[in-house]
């Protein structure tokens, strides 16, 4: 529910969802970023700039886009990194070609990212940060292509130790029958469930604004996006207990009050992979999207992990 949470914070009663999306893209352009679409088996879309600074790969969460999730992070890191902001398959401008395609997996997403990196000419290993579903993509990318990843930073990520039973219990606590029902969001009013789960504080949202967000950022993509979650559910027995073969340094960032993917899940990932305690940080007064709720606090933690001398796995 990332894009929905972001828009809930960013839009006021006099704004339109489409206007906000365009404003975000204009800010990226002002910082020197350009949009790239590569036609392989369909459009693979990414924002990127190349000023000679180290590249940093940022992967958005479920329902998000690279621009919507990461524009604040990109601005705060503008003097240090040239960020790579892809739209994952079934999201944003990487979704136009596959609106009816189903069964996309984390491996498909990882291949999509490699296609983009190759197309941009980024061959050296880069640090990758992945939030929520994007955390799962980043985790699999680092496992499949360790030669392309310098370090892995999982941020409130859907990586392992998260079962359908746990997800459904969280959904029921917020008045929904199941997590799949929350993510399916067949009506604009259903977006409220996802927003409550994503944010530390619930913003007051008028119905007309929910309808705008739904029409612009949810309805066109939901049929394809829901297949991403169904793929994870189909492989739940492996996914929940998976111990990744990571050969790069791994760090974890979590929102202190993340109700969507709780801290306990992050701690379980830390312990399952025997990661150092110093590679785990929680950000106070944040939920599932700390980089949106407290962007400066998030970047301070991220910067410390990006510049740290890691304890090798």
Feature-to-residue mapping (PLM):
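Active-site loop/oxyanion-hole signature of alpha/beta-hydrolase fold enzymes
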Residues: 85-129
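Short beta-strand/loop motif that positions the catalytic acidic residue
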Residues: 246, 252-254, 258
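Flexible "cap/lid" loop of the alpha/beta hydrolase fold
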Residues: 143, 151-186
């Amino acid at each position: 529910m990332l894009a929905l949470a972001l828009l809930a914070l960013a839009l006021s009663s006099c704004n339109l969802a489409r206007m906000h999306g365009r404003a975000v893209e204009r800010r990226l352009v002002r910082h020197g970023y350009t949009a790239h679409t590569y036609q392989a088996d369909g459009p693979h879309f990414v924002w990127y700039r190349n000023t000679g600074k180290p590249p940093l790969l940022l992967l958005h969460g479920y329902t998000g886009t690279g621009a919507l999730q990461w524009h604040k992070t990109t601005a705060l890191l503008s003097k240090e990194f040239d960020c790579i902001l892809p739209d994952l398959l079934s999201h944003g401008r990487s979704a136009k070609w596959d609106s009816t395609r189903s069964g996309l997996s984390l491996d498909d997403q990882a291949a999509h990212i490699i296609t983009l990196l190759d197309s941009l000419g980024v061959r050296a290993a880069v640090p990758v940060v992945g939030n929520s579903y994007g955390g799962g993509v980043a985790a699999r990318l680092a496992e499949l292509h360790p030669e392309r990843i310098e370090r892995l930073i999982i941020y409130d990520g859907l990586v392992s130790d998260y079962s359908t039973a746990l997800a459904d219990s969280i959904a029921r606590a917020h008045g929904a029958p199941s997590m799949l029902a929350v993510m399916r969001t067949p009506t604009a009013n259903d977006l409220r469930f996802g927003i409550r789960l994503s944010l530390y504080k619930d913003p007051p949202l008028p119905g007309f604004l929910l309808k705008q967000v739904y029409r612009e950022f949810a309805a066109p993509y939901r049929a394809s996006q829901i297949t991403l979650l169904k793929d994870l559910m189909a492989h739940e027995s492996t996914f929940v207990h998976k111990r990744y073969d990571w050969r790069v340094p791994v760090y974890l960032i979590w929102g202190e009050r993340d109700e969507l993917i709780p801290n306990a899940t992050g701690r379980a990932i830390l312990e399952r992979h025997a990661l150092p305690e110093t590679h785990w940080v929680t950000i106070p007064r944040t939920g599932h999207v700390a980089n949106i709720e407290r962007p400066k606090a998030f970047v301070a933690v991220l910067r410390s992990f990006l510049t740290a001398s890691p304890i090798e796995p």
